[in-house]
């Protein structure tokens, strides 16, 4: 039951991600289509212009111009109704009805300063570079989203698509601002004319604005898809690592937590190199050195972590005999050290002490056998031999006797006294 529930959850998540990618793809091509239609059509602006050569007179009126009651002159002609786009203007009324002409952004009768901001705006408006750039970026973003459905392992594709969509939206809104700022409300040649005509924006202009909104929405959606995929990939890699650690440590009983407790290879390498350099600088241990004394050999803590001290069974009888021999004076020792101590305490001879010291040695075994050298045994000798006894002091002379030197001096004195003069 739990597996079925988990499968349903995974299927729901996958469907949700698939829906997001599908919506992003559809939105990308929809925004591209809207922007393409807006660029290629001539319904950005509705206004009146004198380019159509129309008058306010009725079509069948052949009489003189109509004058007001006060004798005023003919009413000024506001021009015919036109619709314009980024490239041309078309007449809807007058003698040139249905005729479209190219928009002249720089009339001959007008002198423009080439360093002015108005001139630069008209140049950008005439080139229409920002709307075209927006359409190109939208097309590239849609292709990247479609490719991300095929190459699902490459998450950077969907991220690049999101960046392209955001850049396309920014380019679109810049183009709209430039279009409004370049005085596109009156494309007629007379700029000095009093601007009393009303104008309105057409559906091409609104298509461009809708393309901007779609570009920003699908850009945010694409970035969100990238974040979710990256998070899922990170969690999947971490779970795979833990599973691999659990399978490797299952035989040893350590589990996946053993991987987390392992030190880094660099730290182990530094410790090992430091211990090897320290061991090479020290002198090689002699067979008479004690393993626990201050002058003993230094072993690397990383190579041999634990030792057990044991007595060689072949030397047990000799050590026991020495211990029993020295038990009268110094008591029985334990192991090899006990035999040597008993021989020394019992007042034994130097040869017996040497035999005890040579017989009482220890064997060190590595508690964790290694694969390369599983049967290696390190042998270190026992305690150093006792120092040689000092020479015996000369015996004191008995009471009432003279030493040889004193007797010789007395003899010389007697000889002097008995010699005749």
UniProtKB/Swiss-Prot annotation:
Identification of the protein by name: Voltage-dependent calcium channel gamma-8 subunit
Pfam families found in the cross-reference section: PMP22_Claudin
Question: Which residue ranges traverse the bilayer?
Answer: 19-39, 127-147, 157-177, 207-227, 318-338
What is this protein's function per UniProt? Regulates the activity of L-type calcium channels that contain CACNA1C as pore-forming subunit. Regulates the trafficking and gating properties of AMPA-selective glutamate receptors (AMPARs). Promotes their targeting to the cell membrane and synapses and modulates their gating properties by slowing their rates of activation, deactivation and desensitization and by mediating their resensitization. Does not show subunit-specific AMPA receptor regulation and regulates all AMPAR subunits. Thought to stabilize the calcium channel in an inactivated (closed) state.
Tell me the classification of the organism that encodes this protein.
Eukaryota, Metazoa, Chordata, Craniata, Vertebrata
PTM summary from the entry reads:
Palmitoylated. Probably palmitoylated by ZDHHC3 and ZDHHC7.
Annotated organism of origin: Rattus norvegicus (Rat)
Instruction: Give start-end positions of Low complexity composition bias.
Output: 276-287
* Annotated GO biological process: positive regulation of synaptic transmission, glutamatergic; postsynaptic neurotransmitter receptor diffusion trapping; regulation of AMPA receptor activity; regulation of postsynaptic membrane neurotransmitter receptor levels; transmission of nerve impulse
Please describe the quaternary structure of this protein. Answer: Interacts with CACNA1C. Identified in a complex with the L-type calcium channel subunits CACNA1C, CACNA2D1 and either CACNB1 or CACNB2. Acts as an auxiliary subunit for AMPA-selective glutamate receptors (AMPARs). Found in a complex with GRIA1, GRIA2, GRIA3, GRIA4, CNIH2, CNIH3, CACNG2, CACNG3, CACNG4, CACNG5 and CACNG7. Interacts with CNIH2. Found in a complex with GRIA1, GRIA2, GRIA3, GRIA4, DLG4 and CNIH2.
Q: Which UniProt keywords apply?
A: Calcium, Calcium channel, Calcium transport, Cell membrane, Ion channel, Ion transport, Lipoprotein, Membrane, Palmitate, Phosphoprotein, Postsynaptic cell membrane, Synapse, Transmembrane, Transmembrane helix, Transport, Voltage-gated channel
Principal location:
membrane
Q: Which GO terms describe its molecular function?
A: calcium channel regulator activity; channel regulator activity; ionotropic glutamate receptor binding; protein phosphatase 2B binding; voltage-gated calcium channel activity
* Keyword Repeat in annotation: no
- List locations, semicolon-separated: Cell membrane; Postsynaptic density membrane
Polar residues bias locations: 408-421
Residue numbers of Phosphoserine PTMs: 251, 254
Bilayer topology annotation: Multi-pass membrane protein
């Amino acid at each position: 039951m739990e597996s079925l529930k988990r499968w349903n959850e995974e299927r729901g998540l996958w469907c949700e991600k698939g829906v997001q990618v599908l919506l992003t793809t559809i939105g990308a091509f929809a925004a591209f289509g809207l922007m393409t239609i807006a660029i290629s059509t001539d319904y950005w602006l509705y206004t009146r212009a004198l380019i159509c050569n129309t008058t306010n007179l009725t079509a069948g009126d052949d009489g003189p111009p109509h004058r007001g009651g006060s004798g005023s002159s003919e009413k000024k002609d506001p021009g015919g109704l036109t619709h314009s786009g980024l490239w041309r203007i078309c007449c809807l009324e007058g003698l040139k009805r249905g005729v479209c002409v190219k928009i002249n952004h720089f009339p001959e009768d007008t002198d423009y300063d080439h360093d002015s901001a108005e001139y630069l705006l008209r140049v950008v408006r005439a080139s229409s570079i920002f709307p075209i750039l927006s359409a190109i970026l939208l097309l590239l973003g849609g292709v990247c989203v479609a490719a991300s459905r095929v190459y699902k392992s490459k998450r950077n594709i969907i991220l690049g698509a999101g960046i392209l969509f955001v850049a396309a939206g920014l380019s679109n809104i810049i183009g709209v601002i430039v279009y409004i700022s370049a005085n596109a409300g009156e494309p007629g040649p007379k700029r000095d004319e009093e601007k009393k005509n009303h104008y309105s924006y057409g559906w091409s202009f609104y298509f461009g604005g809708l393309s901007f909104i779609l570009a920003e929405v699908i850009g945010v959606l694409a970035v969100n898809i990238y974040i979710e995929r990256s998070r899922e990939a990170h969690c999947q890699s971490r779970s795979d690592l833990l599973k691999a650690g659990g399978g490797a440590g299952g035989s040893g009983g350590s589990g996946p937590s053993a991987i987390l407790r392992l030190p880094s290879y660099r730290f182990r390498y530094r410790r090992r190199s430091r211990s090897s350099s320290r061991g090479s600088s020290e002198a090689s241990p002699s067979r008479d050195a004690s393993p626990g004394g201050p002058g003993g050999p230094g072993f690397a803590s990383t190579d041999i972590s634990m030792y057990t001290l044991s007595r060689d069974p072949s030397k047990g009888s000799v050590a026991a005999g020495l211990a029993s021999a020295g038990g009268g004076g110094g008591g029985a020792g334990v192991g090899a050290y006990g035999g040597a101590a008993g021989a020394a305490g019992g007042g034994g001879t130097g040869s017996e002490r040497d035999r005890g010291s040579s017989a009482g040695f220890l064997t060190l075994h590595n508690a964790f056998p290694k694969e390369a050298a599983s049967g290696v045994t390190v042998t270190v000798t026992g305690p150093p031999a006792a120092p040689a006894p000092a020479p015996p002091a000369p015996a004191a002379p008995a009471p009432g006797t003279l030493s040889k030197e004193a007797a010789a001096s007395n003899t010389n004195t007697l000889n002097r006294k008995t010699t005749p003069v």
